[in-house]
């Protein structure tokens, strides 16, 4: 009986010695590490092959956002290399049977699944792979508080609170600030989403609210003002609008007055030019031209030589300048000598429509002075004068 037992034991031992097996052990499959710190991922292995020349160790990383794992560390024959985002951050163990690695300066993006693979040909059987789930813990970042709806009495509003970072996911709590006291809100809210709904805002519910995001690493908070009335804001806005309207009115009045002044000045200049136009058309030859040249009549007056000799009994009369008319000269008294009178060329500028000859109206004959005889020109003399 005892002989038979030892016989079976020897047979099983021989069979086990002929099978090559690699066994990988992971002491802790869940690892939590705070952001910025170092973490050691423990992976222990055993192999039935004494030689380590063909031994290879590989670590892979599977991010939750990635579809396939990526290789981050590989070691074989004493040579190790880190790859990708973990380059220069991974240090591997050189101890036999220890495939652990240490990652420095962990970041939120390093959270995910890590896979340890150990191979030592000809050991191909057994459990040569281990899996670790690593979470990088992050304190909640300062949440963003916002309000949807009009924060006025009688309106329905909702308050939201959300932190962009935080591992594990934070939970949210709402409180109302009453002076120095922090009072939990009476309304129901969702601690997972951080949404607080106020169905009918009253004066009692108006004020300042605080939201706090909490996880195992810490907490952060934000505040929001639900004061519906802000008189100072209304005054500022009203003053600003009034200033803009007043400036616009002033600019309009100034522009209108300027344009009106320009129009009056332009009208005044045009009237002045119209009044000065007739003056600019005066004949440069002087006032001696009063009639057209073709209507000019030359008169010859003969005065006695005794006109220059005035006796003591002669009464001097004012000089008389004959008018430039075409009436015939009065007949001289008999016995007087004719006196030559300077020829007078009289021209009159007539309108185009009145170019026809005008018949001179007879004027009363001036009283002849004593001793002065004016004889009319004969037809022959008139012809000579006209020639």
From Swiss-Prot:
Glycosylation sites: 32, 38, 133, 200, 219
A Pfam cross-reference name: Ig_3
Regions of compositional bias (Acidic residues) in chain numbering: 344-368
Positions of transmembrane segments: 233-253
Position of the signal peptide: 1-21
Biased composition (Pro residues): 325-335
Disulfide bonds: 43-116, 161-211
Keyword Nuclease: no
Post-translational modification comment from the UniProt entry: Highly N-glycosylated. Appears not to contain significant amounts of O-linked carbohydrates or sialic acid in its sugar moieties.
Predominant subcellular localization, coarse grouping: membrane
Biased composition (Basic and acidic residues): 284-296
UniProtKB keywords: Disulfide bond, Glycoprotein, Immunoglobulin domain, Membrane, Repeat, Signal, Transmembrane, Transmembrane helix
Protein known as: V-set and immunoglobulin domain-containing protein 1
Gene coding for it: VSIG1
């Amino acid at each position: 009986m005892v002989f038979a037992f030892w016989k079976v034991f020897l047979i099983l031992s021989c069979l086990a010695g002929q099978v090559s097996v690699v066994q990988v052990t992971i002491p802790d499959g869940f690892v939590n590490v705070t952001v910025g710190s170092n973490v050691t991922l423990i992976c222990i292995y055993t192999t039935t092959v004494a030689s380590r020349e063909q031994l290879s160790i590989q670590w892979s990383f599977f991010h939750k956002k990635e579809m396939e794992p990526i290789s981050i560390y590989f070691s074989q024959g004493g040579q190790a290399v880190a790859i990708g985002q973990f380059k220069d951050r991974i240090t591997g163990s050189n101890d036999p049977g220890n495939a652990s690695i240490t990652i420095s300066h962990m970041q939120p993006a390093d959270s995910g699944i890590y896979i340890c693979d150990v191979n030592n040909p000809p050991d191909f059987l057994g459990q040569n792979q281990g899996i670790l789930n690593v979470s990088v813990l992050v304190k909640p970042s300062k949440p963003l508080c916002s309000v949807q709806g009009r924060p006025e009495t009688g309106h329905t509003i909702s308050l939201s609170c959300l932190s962009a970072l935080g591992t594990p996911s934070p939970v949210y709590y709402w409180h109302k600030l009453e002076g120095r006291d922090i009072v939990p809100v009476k309304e129901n809210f969702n601690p997972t989403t951080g949404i607080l709904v106020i169905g009918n805002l009253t004066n009692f519910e108006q004020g300042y609210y605080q939201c706090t995001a909490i996880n195992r690493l810490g907490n952060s908070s934000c505040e929001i003002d639900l004061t519906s009335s802000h008189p100072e804001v209304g005054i500022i806005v009203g003053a600003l609008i009034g200033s803009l309207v007043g400036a616009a009115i002033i600019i309009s009045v100034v522009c209108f007055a300027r344009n009106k002044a320009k129009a009056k000045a332009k009208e005044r200049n045009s009237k002045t030019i119209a009044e000065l136009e007739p003056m600019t058309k005066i004949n440069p030859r002087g006032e001696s031209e009063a009639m057209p040249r073709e209507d000019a009549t030359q008169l010859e007056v003969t005065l006695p030589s005794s006109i220059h000799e005035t006796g003591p009994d002669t009464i001097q009369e004012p000089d008389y300048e004959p008018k430039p008319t075409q009436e015939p000269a009065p007949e001289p008294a008999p016995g007087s000598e004719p006196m030559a009178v300077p020829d007078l060329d009289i021209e009159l500028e007539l309108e185009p429509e009145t170019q026809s000859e005008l018949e001179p109206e007879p004027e009363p004959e001036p009283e002849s002075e004593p001793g002065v005889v004016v004889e009319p020109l004969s037809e022959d003399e008139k012809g000579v004068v006209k020639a």
